[in-house]
Structure formats: structure tokens, C-alpha cells
Amino acid sequence: MKVKVSYLGYIRVMLGKREEEMELKEGATIGDLLNMLSDKYGEAFRKEVYEPGLQDLKYGYGVIVNGLLMARLQGLKTPLKDGDQVILTTLISGG
């Protein structure tokens, strides 16, 4: 299956691209996608965004699937399906 991954904020600058299409196995989850991205982009990605061993995004990053923040779904265990739109972004907060 294929999902479209868009990058916003600093991650877009770091990776040097706006979006890409990723090929995943049927039944893949957000965690599987992040592991693939970690393998593809290596140390820079792991250091900034996601550490596979920790199984969590680093502080300040979020994943949105089809308009919903993954925290409102099933977190990293959220299943993906063909045609999903995934956004990896820095989170901004204020006070």
C-alpha cells in the first residue's frame, strides 16, 4: 500500500523535501512508517524526530493522519491504509 507523507516545519528543512510517497506492507502502523523513515534518513532523523528504541516521537513533534492527530487515534499503533495522508510536523504551543 502507498501513503503520502508530508513534512512541515523544521523537518521539511532538514529532509529537504515537502512530501513523498512511501510503500508499506498491508496492516502497517504509524510506528512502522516512522521506523522506515528512521532507516531511510538515518542518524539525523533519529536524533531530531524519532528514536526507534524508545518507540515514541521526540518532544515537539506530531503525526497527523487524514486530519487527526495520532494521539487522538491509537498513537503509534494507529493502522494505516492505502491512500492515507500523513503529516509529520513540529508542534507549536504558546501561553
Show where each model-derived region lies:
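Ubiquitin-like/PB1-type beta-grasp interaction modules and other compact soluble beta-rich domains
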Residues: 1-94
